[in-house]
Amino acid sequence: MKHIIYIFLLCSIFSFAQVRVVKELDSNWKFQKRKSLEAYQINFNDANWEKVNVPHDWAIYGPFDKEIDKQNVAIVQNGEEVASEKTGRTGALPHIGSAWYRNNFNIPEYETGKKVILLFEGAMSEPKVYLNGKKVGEWAYGYSYFYFDISKDIKEGENSLAVEVSNP
């Protein structure tokens, strides 16, 4: 009988367990390669922006050019005393500057008080993240995962996510 009560109690505990819900935001993104001071705003017009799915690496669009990151230096650690041409420091990425990603998504049912985490598996680089017009965080790196607690900023219904990235 003790075993039956124990199993019943375990079943009761598991029935109250929280259910984790995952919403992937890998499609329906809009993208623009340019600096914009207003792109984080909820009603920003992104109708003419390129449609992309993520993962998407904005910095590799266009031809690679070694002139972008060419240097004439002597690398002391390599024992060099005479300067010579070096390339590849940044991989000769074809775009230097800023770009934006935007995604409008729907949360059909949301209970206030639930914990909501926005997880990025990487964003190159120095992303600034906005949800519903409010900056929710930034990350100083590139191809590494990061996350923000957006529990206070998410809402039931339509939400607007904007991410500014830069390749300085």
Question: Language-model segments: which ranges?
Answer:
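Short glycine/threonine/proline-enriched tight-turn/helix- or strand-capping micro-motif at secondary-structure
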Residues: A83-G88
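Accessory beta-strand-rich segments of carbohydrate-active enzymes
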Residues: V21-L25, K30-K35, G91-P168
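Accessory carbohydrate-binding/adhesion or oligomerization-edge regions at the termini
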Residues: A17-V82, V136, S160-P168
